[in-house]
Amino acid sequence: MVNFASEVDKNNAFDSAHPSRKCKGSLDCNDPDPIFRHKVLVIIHKLAISSWNRIPLTLCNKLHIKRISGALTNAVYYVAPPEGYHAPKLLLRIYGPHVELFINRQVELENLKRLARHNIGPYLIGEFSNGRFEQYMESTTLTCKTIRDPKLSIYVGRRLCELHNFILLHPHEVLEMPAAWKNCLVWLPKAKAKILGRKHSLAITSEFMKTLEEDFNAYYNWFVEWSRDKKDWFGLKMVFSHNDTQYGNLLKIKAKKRSIPLSQKHRTLVPVDFEYAGPNLCAFDLANYFAEWMADYHHPTHNYLMDRSRYPDFNARKLVYHAYVEQSAVINDLLEIEDASLLKTDISDELKNTFEKQIMNLEESVRAISPAANIGWALWGILQCLEEDDEWEDLSVSSQVADRPEKQLVEGSTVPPIGTSSFDYIGYSSEKFDLFYEGCAALGLNGRNRSTFSYA
């Protein structure tokens, strides 16, 4: 398998055998700029990252550091050496607050190494107390607009299929509860406790959370019964799943036009941020990806809203499904493709019928699992809301959120540090809870007077 990262920048590539190092030390993205830069270079020196030891600490103010947009859980930065120094560009990831509620870092780091063996995602370079350095890939992050490109939809379908098939589950993972249910069952009682412990009332109340728990249990029981005779369905396989397939976690790497065969062009699309990755049902990544079409996390005033009109129609979803099942046939040596950006048309009737059955199977599975994806992120939003926000009356009111004081930005940043009030987590959770109920209504379950979600 080709390592496409190395095709981008030969001098910037690390291979899967590159030993990652560990050191003590932590970074605070709210530190004044000179202090932040100095600490970054000190930790790089401690980790003995290739060629960086030649850069003296006195030049820390000459580092190129830029905040990268897209990540909601962590603060992520691009770090490059001063002019005149040749050292690999780095991706710096500073873990966000309260992430221990969601993420087992040891499992995540093991998964990164596991993925690197298949050239999926960046390589881990070094770890420190509250973050890590990764291989930097020259790339463009997908946006709420670019994900609507049909060619990229084909790439997404192919890449998700490869992720689900190349990374084999460990024996103990096969026996685990799918993350779609496991996360909700763990996060729901914690979210209830958080709402109950608030000093000030929110739009999301304790009474709402009690009703939600009952409705989630009813939905879960429905899914168990519905899927009982569908264990062999394509969309219900247990796979190694990304579990956070939002557009900010998909990179389009920059590669020389002739460096990658046409049949493998889809591998210029690189999934990143595997913090939530683990065993899950195949359809979850697809359902979550489609749900993220409704989001615009960089909207200047309403970054928490979900625009239902932006949800992909069936033809757009079918394009992703078709690419997924076609790539599965490629992996199983049932088909060869010449150009990964196109779908094959000259296939046997038998394979065509198989694809049609698998596509409808995926569509039904996506509709069934979509409420789980939405309620999971709704609970995540509540738990992400910082304790310090108790000082504010109601986080669900956008105008109040916009008026709060901002913390200091690091030079060159384009988005605020993790922990600032720029993202309305409670407003986001309210939107996702509504989508949960709308999805339940579409399945014939109690939607609590919400409209039925239209899959068009």
UniProtKB/Swiss-Prot annotation:
Disulfide bonds: none annotated. Gene3D superfamilies: 3.90.1200.10, Phosphorylase Kinase, domain 1 (3.30.200.20). One of its GO terms (molecular function) is choline kinase activity. Its main location: cytoplasm. Monomer. One of its GO terms (biological process) is phosphatidylethanolamine biosynthetic process. Catalyzes the committed step in the synthesis of phosphatidylcholine by the CDP-choline pathway. The keyword ATP-binding applies. Its EC number is 2.7.1.32. It comes from the Eukaryota. Pathway: Phospholipid metabolism; phosphatidylcholine biosynthesis; phosphocholine from choline: step 1/1. InterPro entries: Choline_kin_N, Kinase-like_dom_sf. PANTHER family: CHOLINE/ETHANOALAMINE KINASE, RE24176P. This is Choline kinase. It holds the Pfam family Choline_kin_N. Keywords: ATP-binding, Cytoplasm, Kinase, Lipid biosynthesis, Lipid metabolism, Nucleotide-binding, Nucleus, Phospholipid biosynthesis, Phospholipid metabolism, Transferase. Belongs to the choline/ethanolamine kinase family. It catalyses: choline + ATP = phosphocholine + ADP + H(+). The keyword Cell cycle does not apply. Its cofactor is Mg(2+). GO terms for cellular component: cytoplasm; cytosol; nucleus. It comes from Schizosaccharomyces pombe (strain 972 / ATCC 24843).
